[in-house]
């Protein structure tokens, strides 16, 4: 079944430790706390909730479809085939790159963003050049200015750097 984790500045919290917790921890060694009850979550400044199902993406898609029918004060999207995330409205990668270019004093037209999942769409659309990896689903690729011929495990980002940075000079 589905499992959830709530993220705060120092890691994530969950209601039970199980194989999903351990698998997620093994990916990034992010510290976590097992809560004794759901009310304890109020002690943390949560910035994201992730619903995980490593075995049944269809369950996550049903959740996405149900959420889409409602008016909630948050954005939701897939960040991988197994992770469906919720965060406050407007806290996304597109907002992040917009803030960063202002902070650094550079023009948005001079940026490149590369992504492969729903959580990358806002960034791909915001960047001067939005790139989708070839292994991204077609609906993600539709938002991009360019689609790589290689995926992220086979030098896809290097392909982007060569085409838009090295060869452009």
Language-model regions: role of each:
Residues 85-169:
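Mg2+-dependent phosphoryl-transfer enzymes with acidic/Ser/Thr/Gly-rich catalytic loops
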Residues 1-114:
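Conserved acidic, metal-coordinating active-site core of Asp-based
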